[in-house]
């Protein structure tokens, strides 16, 4: 998030070596770990040799199990970092309602878990493919995501990310997230959510096409 890019094994190997060299703890956010396209599964930082020596990984139920708003997650990895995290948790927050935690456990242990997750991933991949194809037909360049449920799209020349987002909202009735909200390197892009039905995504592209912004 927001680009849909996935980390390679080589990247993580360099990261582990860097963390060991400079004695820096690594925190990996694996929220979209189950959502990979084109037959590829995103690589967990914890799969790398030495990763548990230098870092931890967060996993949330919000994306994979559509439990956004329940605020249920867990962390695994380096014991010392986990202990420090628990200390912070104890002082800053109260525990999550136990019923929600047990629901998360049931979701992880459910026999049909993998089959249901695959259905969700297939749905996102179908939307991704249809949206990217429709966007390319009108000349809108995209970074094709390898995971997540977002598309990372270039802003046409002459507009900032915010200006383009405002234009789409006001003139086409299409809401996107301006890229500069994700940091300075996001300027020049917008993020599109692929969380609505296929027909509505195609309708959004049709509305944008009528603005004649792409050559």
Predicted features along the sequence, with ranges:
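PLP-dependent class I/II
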Residues: 1-215
